[in-house]
Amino acid sequence: MTPCKEPPGGARNLLILTLSEFALIERLRRRLVGPPDQIWVGDDVAVVPAPVGAMLLASDAVVAGVHADLRLVGLDDMGWKAMVANVSDIAAVGGRPCCAVVTVAGPLGKIDFDLLYDGLTAASSAYDCPIVGGDLTSSDTLVVSVAIVGDGGGGDLPAPVLRSGARAGDAIFVTGPLGSSAAGLHLLQTGRVSEAPDLVLAHRRPRARLDEGTAARLAGATAMIDVSDGLAADLRHIADASGIGVVLERVPVAIGVNRVSNDPESMALGGGEDYELLFTAPDPDLVESTFAARGLGKPLRIGRCTGDAGERRLRDGELPALGWEHT
């Protein structure tokens, strides 16, 4: 795979360069197909059916040069990532996405917005989360901001799972091995894409774990977060919010990461953007049986929660301060 260049050029891009802001909005609006019971893009407000029970709201932004290097990935990858990062936040409380609004700020004469929306709409379709509106404005830096409304459910479902409910004695689980995205980014940065296309794809097109989030919620998860900042950082987030200690007994490293890094465990601990779900639960047998009953892979048990609120251990040593920090 050849690293993508931006802007891509071609006849489509030449057309976009000539469009006014309102004409571009209309062009993008025609790409969005919504359910018939919604008032669609064109009004300043989208009217959507309200969830029964808890309503979930998530918002996150992807900034070119900060969260996406457009010398290495395409605008469609940036759009995909912006949507999936928010869907993953909904998954991390055990909810389901309902709809999204997308705000894009960027240099209107230099960006192929159709390509950007290829990624946004592909992700919204993959996760059944229609784009119902948004905004478009001019900016020197490309920023894609997505806000999602989600359904937290009600009735017999347990409450949505926050990161603050872990208790001493809970086991710590993660839904899959880690480090794939960081390894893929490293391959892109070093021009070694052909060595492990699956790792590159894990970075370019991450996946949200919606079904796993629901299963963890049904299995009595007490705290949950998606692994976006890195296992070490996100485990600290749970421990800090819950006021408990944590002992990480094993670090599950994804297949192939050891071929990319001399320190694959550190890549798994600090790489981030894997979007696996990290959760705590008191009953490991219930976790295993609930995931199995829903046809999902067995979560990996990686540690335990303790009553010492200051404890942050990796095996017999200190949990390293790895991962992404938002400043």
Regions found by a protein language model. Give the residues of each.
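A short, well-structured juxtamembrane/interface segment
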Residues: R205-A215
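Glycine-/charge-enriched secondary-structure boundary and capping motifs
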Residues: G10-V33, V73, P107-V132, T137-V144, ...
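Extreme N-terminal cap/leader segments of soluble proteins
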Residues: P3-E6, G10-G74, V93, V102, ...
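Glycine-rich anion/phosphate-binding loops
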Residues: D37-I39, L70-A85, G109-D118
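Short, compositionally biased
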Residues: A182-L199
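A short, N-terminal amphipathic alpha-helix
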Residues: A82-V93, S124-A126
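Glycine-rich anion-binding loops of enzyme active sites
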Residues: P49-V52, V62, R96-H186, R304
